[in-house]
Amino acid sequence: MGWNFVSNIAKHHDVHAIVEKGEFEETLTRYAAEHPEAVQNITFHFVPRTHHDTLRKIWPPSYYWFYRAWHRKAYQLAVELDKKENFDIVHQVTISGFREPGFLWQLGKPFIWGPLGGFTDTPWCLLRCLDLGGAIHFGIRNVLNSIQKRWGRSARTAAKHSASILTSTTKAVEEIRRFWGREAILMNEVGLETNHQKLCSPPHKEGTPLRICWAGEHIPRKALDLLLHALPLCKEKMELHVLSKGPRMEAWKKLSHKLGLDNVVTFHGFVPREEAFHIMSSSHVFCITSVREDTSTVVFEAFRYGLPIIALDHCGFSSVINETCGIKIPINAHAQIIADYARHLDYLATHEKERQKLSAGAQEHCQHFTWDAKMEVINRIYADYARHEV
C-alpha cells in the first residue's frame, strides 16, 4: 500500500519519504539502484524501530507502543527536514489503521491523513464462523474498536488538526463524521495500474459446473466456511477452486470432506503467479467471504479478469462492488448469509446473460480504481492546501 502511494505521488511531486529502517531499507535501496528513474523524485529517510517479538506474541497490541515510539523519532526527523525543505504538504499514508496517527500534524503544515482503515467491526453473527481463538479475538476487538473510535484521544486530536482525511470504507466516512465531527473523502487503499490488461471471463454453459474462485490467506477472518456450507445447498453443479494456504487450511479441508465436497472443491495451495492467474481467468465468478477487511487487492484482480464478485455487504466491499459488477449479501444472520451465497450462485449458473453483463461491468467498473484516478483526487487535495499553513 505505502509504496504504491509514494511512487504514484512522486510522479507529480517531490517526495521525502520517512520509512522504517529495518524492514524496508534493503528492499528500497536495491530497487532504487535497479530502477533509478522510478525514484528520481523520492528521497528516502530511514528511521529504526525497536521490536519486541516475544511481548507482541503475548500481547499483540504492544505493537502500538513501539510504533508510537517510532513515530516520535519520525517527527523529530521531520522537524529538522522541514527547516531545510519547508514542506508544502505532510501526508501520513501508513499504517492504514486509525489508532496511531503519529505526530506529523504538529509540524504546522497542511496534514493529509489516510487512507484510514480499521473502522470495520466483525459482525457478531459471524463470530461463529471462526475458531474459538478467532471468535474471542475479534469479539474483544469489536469492543475495543467501539471505544477507540469514540474516545481515542490520539486519533481525535489528529483528525481535528487534519486538513483532509481519506478513508477506505463508506462506514468509516460515516463514523468519522459521527465521532470526530469531520468530513472524509472515500478512497480505498489498493488499486490497479492504469494500463492493466483486460481479460474476459469464459462463457458458461448451463448444466455444466459453474467455476468459482476463492483466494486469500487461510486465516479465521477470511471465513471460507461460509462458502463451503453454501455449496451443498446449491441446486446447480458447482466447482470451487481455493487458492493460497494458511493456518486454517487443514480445518477447511476437513470441513469440505465432511460436507461431501471432495469432488467439488479443489485446494490448490500456493501456486506460481501464472498458474493462479490461469485459474482465475478460467473461472466464472469470484467469491469473497471475509468477515473483516478494508479492501482486498484480490477484488481488483477479479475485476481485471471480468469476474463478477459475490461478497458480504460490509468492509471495503460495500463501496467497491455495485450492481453493475457483482452481488452484495446483506448481513442479518449466519444461516441467511449461507443461503444467499447458494441462491446467488444458482442464479448465475442459470442466467448466463446476466453473468456476462456483470462480467463486462466488472471490467468497466475497475477503471474508477486505478492509481491515476486516485492521483487526480490527491492532486486536487494538495493543490487546495499547498502553502496554506494550519
Language model region names:
Residues F44, W113, L144-C200, G207:
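Donor nucleotide-sugar binding/catalytic pocket of nucleotide-sugar-dependent glycosyltransferases
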Residues L116, P203-K222, L228-L231, H241:
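Conserved donor-binding/catalytic core segment of Leloir-type glycosyltransferases
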Residues K253-V271:
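Nucleotide-activated donor-binding/catalytic signature segment of Leloir-type glycosyltransferases, i.e.
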Residues F270, H278-S283:
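Short alpha-helical donor nucleotide-sugar binding micro-motif in glycosyltransferases
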Residues V291:
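Aromatic "clamp/platform" in nucleotide-sugar-dependent glycosyltransferases that forms part
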Residues P308-A311:
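Short hydrophobic beta-strand element within catalytic cores of glycosyltransferases
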Residues Y347, E354-H368, V377-R380, D384:
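A short, well-ordered alpha-helix in the C-terminal region of glycosyltransferases
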